[in-house]
């Protein structure tokens, strides 16, 4: 399994990512609200597994507990907040890079138009459902940043396997723990002594694709940026090998 290069890229552009923190919290807030609504209004993560998963993601992103609490109160209140639905789009970026875009929207026509526009503008094309998702695996992904050397690699690996992880990977100072989606919350609970730099369910590529053409690389970077900046977009998964 290829290294979790996205984490390295995030670190390289930390200043830019810090500027997007508020936007990231807004997206997570939307996920919290949807998790409560789709969980029958249950705000206790012990009885709402999807909510537990999103709360883990929120805490890894350093979202303040007060923010999380307000989102849960809003979701449980009268009307339950905005009426969002989750829609996933699939397509191809420049050079045939496979792209999956997860959205939460209150207007599917607006979002569908935006997705088609983004793909077309930056050298890609929007495809049919299932056109690329077959080449990805849905996994829980827990990332530990060990830049300070606080953790021993072998100990983390053994703890991860004992906790029920599906796979473990070490690259430079980053440890990545993979789980089956249904095991995610249990593995997180069993690894509570560790601090995660990120923690969520992801679509992990089965293989990666390089772009050697500089124009295609620039277009792919722009496509990812514009997708991630779209208010309706929650996650962008792709198989571009950026190393």
Language-model regions, residue ranges each:
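N-terminal cationic and glycine-rich segments that engage phosphates or anionic surfaces
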Residues: 1-127, 132-141
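Positively charged, low-complexity, intrinsically disordered RNA-binding extensions
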Residues: 141-243
């Amino acid at each position: 399994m290829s290294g979790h290069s996205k984490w390295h890229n995030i670190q390289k552009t930390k200043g830019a990512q810090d500027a997007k923190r508020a936007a990231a919290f807004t997206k997570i807030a939307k996920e919290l609200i949807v998790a409560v609504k789709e969980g029958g209004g249950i705000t206790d993560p012990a009885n709402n597994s999807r909510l537990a998963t999103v709360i883990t993601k929120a805490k890894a992103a350093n979202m303040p507990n007060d923010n999380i609490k307000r989102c849960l109160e809003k979701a449980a209140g009268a009307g339950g907040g905005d009426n969002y639905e989750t829609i996933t789009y699939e397509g191809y970026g420049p050079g045939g890079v496979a792209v999956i875009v997860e959205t939460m929207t209150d207007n599917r026509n607006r979002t569908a138009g935006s997705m088609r526009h983004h793909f077309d503008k930056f050298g890609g094309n929007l495809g049919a459902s299932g056109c690329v998702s077959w080449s990805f695996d849905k996994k829980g992904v827990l990332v530990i940043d060990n830049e300070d050397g606080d953790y021993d690699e072998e100990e983390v690996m053994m703890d991860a396997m004992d906790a029920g992880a599906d796979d473990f990977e070490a690259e430079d100072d980053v440890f990545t723990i993979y789980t089956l989606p249904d095991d995610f919350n249990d593995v997180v609970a069993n690894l509570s002594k560790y601090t995660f730099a990120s923690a969520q369910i992801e679509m992990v590529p089965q293989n990666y694709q390089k772009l050697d053409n500089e124009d295609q690389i620039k277009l792919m970077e722009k496509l990812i940026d514009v997708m991630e900046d779209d208010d309706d977009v929650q996650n962008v998964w792709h198989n571009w090998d950026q190393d």
